[in-house]
Design a protein with these regions (language model features):
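Conserved N-terminal phosphate-binding loop of PLP-dependent enzymes in the Aspartate aminotransferase
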Residues: 1-443
Length: 443
């Protein structure tokens, strides 16, 4: 009997024993190639010596000091490092323990910004359908993942949603990429006008939609137009880079590849690379200064925020990314991964789309390529692919509800940045085998 309240009450899970590089090993000695980083977390693999050394050094000095009494060298260094890789108007970092906490903090920061600025009537959030921003109540309320939201709708704060920027499903055949980008982005303006600009606080979006829709990148010009709309109506832009940030997309921040800068950006997952739970909100000077010059106190906080050991792990993670030139590695290996996936999978009748940026790749499954009709829910494609992949020694991240929270299936890949070409060969080979085996059950 297990005394752990598992995610699934009836799950029988292998017991993890150790990790080495891109591999995990269970207690039975079975080896798994980690092609998803758990959930886009393990950017440096599972046994990086520099990160472990930094954590041990911090533990030997002091493991914990409450931020109501002290700051720490590791938190000060981490905030400085993050800001060094941000545009110049970003100079303050709020450190928390994970992605949901980061999003919750950003939502409250946006609200307090407008209260301190003399606009307390601004209280509405707008986000996108098929988005995911966390499982705590505020983050769940702005998120557009219907399956996750459904049981808790009666207790969620009302938020508003527009269509996602999802070219594979919604770009029309006669539209150019830019035309589609503008049409999708202009939904935000329409929603702001519907609600009244004086009531709208912020727009929340993932630069690359993560697990809910499967590494869906924005089309060219989309976020440029979003930024223009936010500026026009005095709406803050909150970008959620919890999954796609910290180098995952091929740049340290995914928004660097867009023609827009946020007011607040959320980070987590890869920030600590799985060695410690940590998250952050980076605020621009406009938001920070309004609070600093107003009450001077952000009315928020968590016990373990800016945890010294977690910050030490994150410092070592960021330093490793740049010292080892891992952004170059991400871009090189992502090109190889996309090429091999296309070669092995693109012609299969149930592969609809292979997309993403950097080492953040989504594979959308369909019943029919031409119509893009989804697989039937009865196939249980996501669950069967995950199970079979594990049996084949591969960890990937399949999900259902890709299109609307109910229909559609995809597989998310987010391997460690240290992945090598022979690992990619193994990944694609095992994934191809898994898909072909599971597809036999769909007939």
């Amino acid at each position: 009997m297990s005394y752990v309240f598992h995610r699934h009450c009836h799950a029988t899970l292998p017991i993890i024993d150790k990790g080495e590089g891109v591999y995990l090993f269970d207690k039975q000695g079975k080896q798994y190639l980690d092609a998803c980083g758990g959930a886009a977390v393990s950017n440096l693999g599972h046994s990086h010596q520099a990160v472990k050394k930094a954590m041990l050094e911090q533990l030997e000095r002091v493991p914990f000091a409450h931020t109501g009494f002290f700051t720490s060298d590791s938190s000060e260094r981490l905030a400085e490092l993050i800001c060094q890789h941000m545009p110049e108007q970003f100079n303050h970092v709020y450190l928390v323990s994970g992605g949901s906490e980061a999003v919750e903090s950003a939502l409250k920061m946006a609200r307090q910004y407008f209260v301190e600025s003399g606009k307390p009537e601004k209280k509405q959030f707008i986000a996108r359908q098929q988005s995911y921003h966390g499982n705590t109540l505020g983050a769940l309320a702005v998120g557009g993942n219907e399956w996750r939201r459904e049981p808790f709708k009666p207790i969620l704060h009302p938020s508003h949603h527009i269509a996602p920027c999802y070219a594979y499903r919604y770009q029309q055949s006669h539209e150019s990429e830019l035309d589609y980008s503008l049409r999708a982005a202009n939904e935000l303006e329409a929603k702001i006008l519907e609600l009244g600009a004086e009531n709208v606080m912020a727009f929340v979006a993932e630069p690359i939609v993560g697990a809910t829709a499967g590494a869906v990148p924005a089309t060219q010009g989309y976020f440029k137009r979003i930024r223009e709309i936010c500026d026009q109506y005095d709406v803050l832009l909150i970008l959620d880079e919890v999954m796609c940030g910290v180098g995952r997309s091929g740049s340290f921040f995914a928004f660097e590849q867009e023609e827009a800068e946020p007011d607040l950006v959320c980070m987590a997952k890869g920030l600590g690379a799985g060695y410690q739970p940590i998250g952050a909100v980076v605020a621009n000077d406009r938001v920070y200064q309004a609070i600093a010059d107003g009450s001077g106190f952000f009315q928020h906080g968590h016990t373990f925020m800016a945890h010294p050991v977690a910050c030490a792990a994150a410092v070592a993670t960021i330093e490793t990314i740049f010292q080892d030139d891992l952004l170059t590695a991400v871009n090189q290996q992502s090109a190889l991964l996309r090429n091999e996936l296309t070669s092995a999978l693109a012609d299969l009748p149930y592969i609809g789309d292979i997309r993403g940026k950097g080492l953040f790749v989504g594979i959308e499954l369909v019943a029919d390529k031409e119509s893009k009709a989804p697989l039937s829910k009865a196939t249980l494609a996501d669950k069967r692919i995950k199970q079979r992949a594990m049996e084949n020694g591969l960890m990937c991240y399949p999900m259902g509800g890709t299109i609307d929270g109910v229909n559609g299936h995809h597989i998310l890949l987010a391997p460690p940045f240290i992945i090598q070409s022979h690992h990619i060969d193994e990944l694609v080979g095992k994934l191809s085998l898994t898909l072909k085996e599971v597809a036999e059950t769909w007939k």
